[in-house]
């Protein structure tokens, strides 16, 4: 929380006075945060898979490949070439939406262990940091043009009491989608951060 307040103070002092230096620092913090979340997502998914029988893994993976993540409704680059062509503001806006889409579902990932209980607060901190970066880079443009009213439906069966098999499937889906989305956000923020370094090679 102290770090968030510090970032807010930096913004209020005017990031425009030193756009490169302040943006680079804010980007470094945001990238570090999403890298931590991505690694955490990978570990949680790996641990969950390890607890399954081989046939359960095969069936759940088969089902997941035929299904969609809730966040797939958020329009994002379809490949690395489109990612590299996207503006910094677009990458930040998509990252913000992806993180925001996990604020509610992430609650079901919490509990049972210290790492799981870190997810929601770390997502909140990351969302705040990305919003600061959007404001610092928007140059008068709308933050979320055309799609500010986008509403995502909850994950399937989220509110229901589920049988053992359905509960297993929902947990697998949530962990797999969380890992997938944190990888996306890490990629988008890393590319956007690289754009601030004219000498850097931002090839994915």
UniProtKB/Swiss-Prot annotation:
Q: Does Nucleus count among this protein's keywords?
A: no
Q: Which CDD domains match?
A: somatotropin_like
Which of the residues bear the PTM Pyrrolidone carboxylic acid?
18
Q: Identify its protein family.
A: Belongs to the somatotropin/prolactin family.
Which residues are involved in binding Zn(2+)? 36, 186
- GO biological process terms, semicolon-separated: animal organ development; growth hormone receptor signaling pathway; positive regulation of growth; positive regulation of receptor signaling pathway via JAK-STAT; response to nutrient levels
Molecular function GO terms recorded: growth hormone activity; growth hormone receptor binding; metal ion binding
Location(s) in or outside the cell: Secreted
Identify the SUPFAM superfamilies for this entry.
Answer: 4-helical cytokines
Key word Translocase present in the record? no
Q: Which GO terms describe its cellular component?
A: extracellular space
Q: Which Pfam families match?
A: Hormone_1
Q: Which organism is it from?
A: Sciaenops ocellatus (Red drum)
Disulfide linkages recorded for this protein, renumbered to the chain, are 69-177, 194-202
Q: Kindly report the protein's main subcellular placement as a broad class.
A: secreted
Write the record's keywords in alphabetical order, separated by commas.
Disulfide bond, Hormone, Metal-binding, Pyrrolidone carboxylic acid, Secreted, Signal, Zinc
Write the signal peptide boundaries.
1-17
Q: What is this protein called?
A: Somatotropin
Q: What does this protein do?
A: Growth hormone plays an important role in growth control and is involved in the regulation of several anabolic processes. Implicated as an osmoregulatory substance important for seawater adaptation.
